[in-house]
Amino acid sequence: MEPIWELVEPWGLGLDDLQYFGEYTAKVKQHAIERLREQAENREQNLVLVTGMTPTPKGEGKTVTTVGLGQTLNHVGEEAMIAIREPSLGPVFGVKGGAAGGGRSQVLPMEDINLHFTGDLHALTSAHNLIAAMLDAKISQGDDLNIDINNVSWPRAIDMNDRALRETVVGLGGKTGGTPREDSFILTAASELMAVLCLASDIGDLKERVSRIIVAYDEDGDPVTVEDIEATGPATMLLRDAIKPNVVQTIEGTPALVHGGPFANIAHGTNSLVADKTAFGMGDYLVTEAGFGSDLGAEKFMDVVCRKGDMTPNAVVLVASVRALKYHGLNQWPVDYDEIGEAGVEAVEAGFSNLDKHARNLQKFGVPVVVSVNRFPDDTDEEVQAVLDHCREDLGVRAAESNVFSDGSEGGVDLAENVIEATEESNEEDFRMLYDDDDSIKEKIHTVATEIYGADDVKYTGGALDDIEQMNDLDFDDYPVVMSKTFHSLSDDASQKGAPEGWELEISEVYPSAGAGFLVALTADALTMPGLPARPAAADMDIDGDGNISGLF
């Protein structure tokens, strides 16, 4: 690795522009961010979004593709930056293990990034729990806000998968232990503060967004905000450094901004807007990713992030894999990787319905689509070629085999050339979002459910319709909607593979993320606090007497 100050100097960042965390990691200071935003006006600002088909639980290589494509664009003579989310400890120790790409397309220093990195997640956890503590102090010590303890919407947060904390009771310590009430924990990445951080333009905007977060409702049903409990200043203070984007490097020496990490199944699922705007001032291409399949991350990127950040994508890379196609073709739930390994090209072809639905969905936004077939070691030439032929001949979209995991930029030239062609042919006037701001909340939900997920209709259960009425009363009806849905299926039933038909999307709750500026519509299968599997990835991790880590990725 190259010292970070030397690596980024040709990209417009000097020694005084960085706040250092060792030799290979830094944050970009505010004055440099502002300068780069101005410089972006003289750059091409080609925005390339990487998304994917509905993945297996192990993932199909979106981050590998994002990193590999960024490296390859530089390899073929372009100037490209990379922006990705930073990992959460929960998934790192849970199912997926370490996350920052892999093989010859990874971001370094991998161990630091996956563990504590620059402390952004810790800062968010502290700020979130400070708000929770100040809220409970207000409730138990002279509540002049008349807070309804049965209508507190702000939980606690922890950056660890722990199902035992999904439902808790607090205040059981007697007279000095606070007011007893039901409570819960969420993963830090699921906190509204994470979404706020990633949508804020600067520290001033961050503070304003934090102030309007709704933490509870009073006995009259009116919202109680962070500002009402006087937590705006101290909470934002804890995030003073967290809003600065982190800059590191890929294994081939391309600068990468790794910042923020909201989940795409319960939030908007992309890295921070600050990172994106900074990257636009450093290169002519920005390659970024959206979480999970395109039904979740990409839809939210188009309808929420581009709306909030005034951005227009020039190309979308849809990551597919032989493994994921077999997963759908064999109609598996739960996944059986041994059966996938034994299946042949017939299973691949049987899974095309899922890939096709994702490709058609993306075309609705008016952005050129390039399918990237991320090749795994066990894939046969026949299987990969079947996917490429189907994309080119049946779907009529660009497609390329990607070997960036094994070969780095040498394995991504065909993909990069297709992406360059797509961006050159793109017309920003063709870009369109699925719905307008002034569409009703139910219209927005119905549009996403039918156009993207393939549902026939939407069914509202529990108090969801009352929630929508309340959102209208609070003048939140012009907010975009973030659909909180399982990532295991295009539908709201994780067991349904391919492109399910003849079903209704069930919405159980709608609530505001007033600081982030969107509404969240919950389906029946969405968890804000995941649990560890019977044998988590953590069980295979270790550290020796010299401090060398093994099993992290």
UniProtKB/Swiss-Prot annotation:
Keyword ATP-binding: yes
Any one GO molecular-function label of the UniProt entry: formate-tetrahydrofolate ligase activity
This enzyme's EC code(s): 6.3.4.3
Top-rank lineage group of the source organism: Archaea
Family matches, as PROSITE patterns: FTHFS_1, FTHFS_2
Reaction equations catalysed: (6S)-5,6,7,8-tetrahydrofolate + formate + ATP = (6R)-10-formyltetrahydrofolate + ADP + phosphate
Record keyword Nucleotide-binding present: yes
InterPro entries noted in UniProt: Formate_THF_ligase, Formate_THF_ligase_CS, P-loop_NTPase
Binding site for ATP: T56, P57, K58, G59, E60, G61, K62, T63
Entry-linked CDD domains: FTHFS (cd00477)
Gene3D superfamilies in the record: Domain 2, N(10)-formyltetrahydrofolate synthetase, Formyltetrahydrofolate synthetase, domain 3, P-loop containing nucleotide triphosphate hydrolases
GO biological process: tetrahydrofolate interconversion
Key words, A-Z: ATP-binding, Ligase, Nucleotide-binding, One-carbon metabolism, Plasmid
Pathway the protein takes part in: One-carbon metabolism; tetrahydrofolate interconversion
Family affiliation: Belongs to the formate--tetrahydrofolate ligase family.
HAMAP family: FTHFS (MF_01543)
Name assigned to this protein: Formate--tetrahydrofolate ligase
Gene: fhs
